Amino acid sequence: MIAKLKGLLDETGTDWAVIDVSGVGYLVHCSSKSLAALGEVGEACTVYTDLQVSENDMRLLGFAEASERDWFRLLTQVQGVGSKVALAILSALSTEEVQTACANGDAAMVARAQGVGPKLAGRIVNELKDKAGALPSAPGGAAMAANPAGGASADAVSALENLGFKPAIAARAVATAQGELGEGASESELIRVALKRAAG
């Protein structure tokens, strides 16, 4: 199963993006929030993915953060919530807002999403209320502890090497990016800035 893609943002549409990984273009369907977070066409990006397989279709769903993918998987466990509805919810609400709505039983907040009526919204918050505290709402905290700056830097160097940059150039560009962004910089931020420095 494809869990994550690292490459260049090749093309975008209203609810999808094409990620070029070593010359292979992967079509991923995304929420509007994830699409906005991926950056500009031609820039390096990282997409967390979930493969949905049905009798007549196979599609890759893409997320800018692992926490959004986790919430997508939780939402699609609720009866009546398919990938389209789950993406609509994650387009209308941040993961933090989804978590708050479920924890507080706030069906009205979930019903703000396109295609989600009061009955379905009520079912979502009722079924996910007990699970709301089990997932991180946004990157940071535990996620940062699990992926310290050193790990992010190493992954960023690897990503640049995969894009064709020599190891020395990739390492120098990432080190420069780290200096500019600070120790708390995420992998995607490091890749974005380092790519500009390496190409410059």
Swiss-Prot record:
Alphabetized InterPro entries for the sequence: DNA_helicase_Holl-junc_RuvA_I (IPR013849), Hlx-hairpin-Hlx_DNA-bd_motif (IPR003583), NA-bd_OB-fold (IPR012340), RuvA (IPR000085), RuvA_2-like (IPR010994), RuvA_C (IPR011114), RuvA_C_sf (IPR036267)
UniProt keywords, alphabetically: Cytoplasm, DNA damage, DNA recombination, DNA repair, DNA-binding
Region (Domain II): 65-143
Stretches the record annotates as Flexible linker: 144-154
One Pfam match: RuvA_C
SMART domains: HhH1
UniProt-annotated stretches for the region Domain III: 154-200
Similarity-based family: Belongs to the RuvA family.
Known role: The RuvA-RuvB-RuvC complex processes Holliday junction (HJ) DNA during genetic recombination and DNA repair, while the RuvA-RuvB complex plays an important role in the rescue of blocked DNA replication forks via replication fork reversal (RFR). RuvA specifically binds to HJ cruciform DNA, conferring on it an open structure. The RuvB hexamer acts as an ATP-dependent pump, pulling dsDNA into and through the RuvAB complex. HJ branch migration allows RuvC to scan DNA until it finds its consensus sequence, where it cleaves and resolves the cruciform DNA.
Alphabetized HAMAP family for the sequence: DNA_HJ_migration_RuvA
NCBIfam families: ruvA (TIGR00084)
Entry protein name: Holliday junction branch migration complex subunit RuvA
Organism: Erythrobacter litoralis (strain HTCC2594)
Protein encoded by which gene: ruvA
